[in-house]
Swiss-Prot record:
EC number: 3.6.-.-
Localization in the cell: Cytoplasm
Cofactor binding remark: Binds 1 potassium ion per subunit.
UniProt xrefs under PROSITE patterns: G_TRME
InterPro entries: G_TrmE, GTP-bd, GTP-bd_TrmE_N, GTPase_MnmE, MnmE_dom2, MnmE_helical, P-loop_NTPase, Small_GTP-bd
PANTHER family: TRNA MODIFICATION GTPASE GTPBP3, TRNA MODIFICATION GTPASE GTPBP3, MITOCHONDRIAL
Protein name according to UniProt: tRNA modification GTPase MnmE
Length: 452
């Protein structure tokens, strides 16, 4: 665990050639340290100050200082934020002066960690900050903002309250077995109450698992025969020349990857080697990889040429896709006539036309969004978690609740039921940060940016 008694400093903006850099100091000595660098001192109060900063008698910079007094700050400590002129040398020089005068460099996420430890934010809010910073699309951004603000955290508090009520009823029954008239402590009443809590937890888990696919990225394989336009499609989707495109069959021999972020969904794209019969050992290894990636993909974009759709290679790919989520992509649409389009319409229902070489891929984007964007998630105003560690904790809560419910219905001794309920309670506390392991907390905040 970081030493909370030390005053820390870090840049809150990237150190680069830019107009303005922001530097944050947090800790008991924040005002003392900054005043060592000023001829005209600032008071220990919430305010904004324009000051000249000195190293001894040498002018360093003219800065704007925003000061906050404990506990009314992000970290809950005395905080001084300095807006100085940008530039790598100037920013680093000021940070070095602050360290020289009594601060130490903050670790990654240490400001947020102090905010959590000083009860300024709970753990869901802290994770929400990181979700917001690393958001890849609008859905992730919305969830990050909601969780950072604590807008929906009351739902966890309510779950805890309802669970504690059940635990208390059971404990009374254990401690006073002769009293059989404790309100709400009969087996049917306990089972009903537990079922309600379990349903809420299941709904939270369902929402979160649906959302995390869209926010973290859906593993999307681009597959097909050689020379049907797979690499051109990847380049068009990424809007860059990531993959080599030639008229020579078998150009792509290894896996080429990229990422595309749409409004409410992200795709982790994988361009695979063209699938065909070959005696080339290197190309054959690439084809083996392609077939393996089809198995692992969550979405497959199967690129085909209409004129060869029924040949052996395509039939083999169709067989691999029997139980997969896929879109049939008729690329080079400029060469498909109306008669051929009518035949396609009669034979297939999940297809799109594209012309990657002309960047005409809007139909494909729309189809992907239709298949994977759930309006229930987009418009949902309830708590959604998009962090794997949080989802794991919710799964543990669900597991203990279901064990307890099955035990009650199965006539198990009530004290055994209470053990699982106490564990569910502990996991809810860990989720919101009211109960934690110091090493786990350190690991959580190490994922954050320096200065956050």
């Amino acid at each position: 665990m970081n030493n909370l008694n030390q005053t820390i400093v870090a840049p809150t903006t990237n150190i680069s050639t830019q107009a303005i850099s922001l530097i944050r100091i947090s800790g008991d000595d924040s005002f003392n340290i900054i005043n060592k660098l000023l001829k005209t001192k600032i008071k220990e109060e919430k305010n904004v100050w324009v000051r000249k900063m000195f190293d001894g008698q040498e002018l360093v910079d003219e800065v704007v200082i925003t000061s906050f007094v404990s506990p009314a700050s992000f970290t809950g400590e005395n905080v001084v934020e300095i807006a100085c002129h940008g530039g790598i040398l100037n920013t680093q020089r000021i940070i070095n002066l602050i360290i020289k005068n009594g601060a130490r460099m903050a670790n990654k996420g240490e400001f947020s960690q102090r905010a959590f430890l000083n009860n300024k934010i709970d753990l869901i809010q802290a994770e929400g900050i990181n979700d917001l910073i690393f958001a890849k699309n609008e859905l992730a951004l919305k969830i990050g903002v909601n969780n950072m603000s604590g807008a929906h955290n009351q739902s966890i508090i309510n779950l805890k309250g309802n669970l504690l009520d059940i635990i208390s009823r059971i404990q009374v029954s254990i401690d006073y077995p002769d009293y059989d008239d404790v309100e709400g402590s009969s087996i049917p009443e306990l089972a009903k109450a537990l079922s309600g809590i379990n349903e809420e937890v299941n709904n939270l888990l369902k929402r979160s698992k649906m959302a995390i696919k869209n926010t973290n990225g859906i593993k999307t394989a681009i597959v097909g025969k050689t020379n049907v336009g797979k690499s051109s499609l990847l380049n068009a989707l990424l809007n860059e020349d990531k993959a080599i495109v030639t008229d020579i069959h078998g150009t792509t021999r290894d896996i080429v990857t990229g990422e595309i972020n749409l409004e409410n969904i992200s795709l982790n794209l994988i361009d695979t080697a063209g699938i065909r019969e070959t005696t080339d050992i290197v190309e054959g290894l690439g084809i083996e990889k392609s077939l393996k990636i089809i198995d692992e993909a969550e979405l497959v974009l199967f690129v085909v040429d209409f004129k060869s759709i029924n040949d052996e290679e395509n039939k083999m790919i169709f067989d691999k896709l029997e139980n997969k989520n896929y879109i049939l992509v008729f690329n080079k649409s400029e060469f498909i006539n109306d008669i051929e389009r009518n035949k396609i319409k009669d034979l297939h229902n999940n297809f799109v036309y594209t012309s990657a070489i002309n960047n005409d891929i809007d139909n494909l984007i729309m189809k992907i969004e239709q298949m994977h964007i759930n309006e229930e998630i987009i418009n949902n105003d309830s708590l959604i978690l998009i962090n794997l560690q949080q989802i794991t904790l919710v799964e543990q809560v669900k597991d203990r609740l279901e064990k307890s419910l099955n035990a009650i219905i199965g006539g198990m001794p009530i004290d055994i039921v209470n053990v699982d309920l106490h564990e569910a309670w502990d996991y809810l506390n860990q989720l919101i940060g009211e109960q934690y392991d110091e090493e786990i907390i350190d690991n959580i905040f190490k994922k954050y940016c320096l200065g956050k």
